[in-house]
């Protein structure tokens, strides 16, 4: 059997096993081991590759960025920073058409700039924003749809766990990826906000239960001083992490350490943390870190198996013969990623697709920082699309209202999926949106 045939069968086996429910990292390791064995005809070569990849993949101080930003995210969640951000946005925006929807988007954008996990945003704002919108007469479908849609900002606005993973797989600067995600994240938040205003103006019954917002007399306005105090932790975290990163004071790892220290101080000052909850936060951080570490190790083995087979070079030559230009390649790539997003999770898509597609992106001369932002947006669309739609399932499991079905949530996310797709096309055809803040684009 030729190496190309082995690699092709490995890809098919991998997708089948993941779809059957096998853990992604285990699938990557097992399929890669068998693939190397078949290519080289010697199981000892495959075993040596496993051992070497385990050492090479994460033996770097740069990898410290993963547990630090994960820890920051769990600490700000327990300190109710997201809840406070929503309360401030609610006070400022609720009198606008679709104001609570815009407030949800705005507070999600703030929360995204502190924690890099979309499902954390989905869980927090399902508990905080959905009951408030229902109280004001918003349509249940819209309420859950806007939470699901805006939760994807958590993976685009830095810090972002997906961008960290992309940085490791593509050997790109995590700091540059974070900086490149700022403007696209803000553009997506703005697109959501404008879309909500248009929906509330042109199709009010898609936003409000009875076509108009209901007054809630038991919702007193908070004093300005209280609003400032509620927003202060978010401002401190964003200024210390993103401000320090963009100004060049910190590397990505140092920014993660700073964010974790500030988040810990906020949680302690607010008396939201005791020994039991601290242990819980540290345990959850350990679980996520080990999971990501194992994924990266196994992805390294998979990448080396593909390189050994010659599959990336074969695909580059094949596409060159087809005469496909950079835009054509990118549109096919984005379509593939979105389709995969309907059946497997975000991390799995990156781990499976990038080792094959990065050589082609380089062959076409694409900026890999911009390519990373486009990839993350395309992958995140999968969080909202059936049948997988991870954010949708998180919202359903967190939601206390049994009247809202899974189908309602998927239908509610449809307008936001379309808006996200429009922003994705804008990013593809206007690359400077993601490169404008970089001091040395692509560096």
Regions found by a protein language model. Give the residues of each.
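Alpha-helical transmembrane segments of multi-pass membrane transport proteins
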Residues: 1-443
């Amino acid at each position: 059997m030729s190496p190309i045939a082995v690699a092709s069968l490995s890809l098919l086996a991998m997708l089948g096993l993941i779809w059957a429910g096998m853990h992604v990292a285990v699938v990557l390791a097992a399929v890669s081991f068998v693939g190397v064995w078949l290519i080289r005809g010697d199981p000892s070569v495959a075993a040596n590759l496993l051992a070497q990849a385990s050492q090479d993949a994460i033996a770097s101080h740069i990898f410290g960025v993963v547990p630090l930003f994960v820890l920051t995210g769990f600490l700000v969640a327990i300190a109710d920073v997201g809840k406070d951000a929503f309360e401030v946005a609610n006070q400022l925006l609720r009198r606008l058409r679709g104001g609570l929807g815009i407030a949800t988007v705005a507070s999600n954008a703030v929360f995204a700039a502190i924690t890099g996990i979309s499902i954390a945003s989905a869980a927090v704002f399902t508990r905080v924003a959905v009951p408030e919108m229902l109280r004001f007469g918003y349509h249940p479908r819209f309420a859950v749809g806007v939470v699901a849609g805006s939760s994807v900002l958590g993976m685009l606005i830095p810090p972002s766990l997906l961008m960290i993973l992309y940085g490791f797989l593509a050997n790109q600067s995590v700091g540059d990826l974070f900086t490149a995600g700022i403007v696209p994240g803000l553009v997506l938040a703005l697109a959501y906000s404008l879309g909500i205003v248009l929906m509330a103006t042109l199709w009010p019954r898609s936003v409000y239960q009875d076509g108009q917002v209901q007054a809630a007399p038991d919702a007193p306005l908070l004093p300005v001083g209280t609003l400032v105090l509620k927003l202060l932790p978010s401002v401190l975290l964003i200024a210390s992490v993103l401000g320090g990163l963009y100004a060049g004071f910190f590397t990505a790892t140092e920014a993660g350490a700073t964010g974790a220290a500030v988040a810990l101080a906020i949680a302690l000052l607010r008396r939201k943390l005791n020994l039991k909850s601290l242990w819980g936060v540290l345990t959850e951080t350990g679980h996520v870190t080990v999971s990501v570490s194992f994924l990266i190790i196994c992805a390294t083995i998979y990448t080396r198996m593909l390189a050994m087979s010659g599959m990336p070079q074969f695909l580059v030559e094949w596409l060159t013969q087809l005469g496909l230009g950079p835009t054509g390649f990118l549109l096919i790539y984005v379509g593939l990623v979105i389709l995969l997003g309907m059946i497997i999770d975000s991390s799995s898509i990156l781990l499976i697709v990038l080792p094959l597609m990065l050589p082609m992106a380089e062959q076409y001369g694409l900026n890999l920082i911009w390519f990373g932002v486009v990839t993350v947006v395309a992958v995140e669309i999968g969080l909202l699309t059936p049948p997988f739609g991870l954010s949708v399932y998180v919202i359903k499991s967190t939601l206390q209202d049994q009247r809202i079905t899974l189908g309602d949530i998927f239908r509610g996310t449809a307008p936001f999926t379309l808006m996200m797709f429009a922003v994705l096309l804008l990013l593809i055809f206007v690359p400077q949106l993601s490169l404008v803040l970089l001091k040395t684009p692509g560096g």
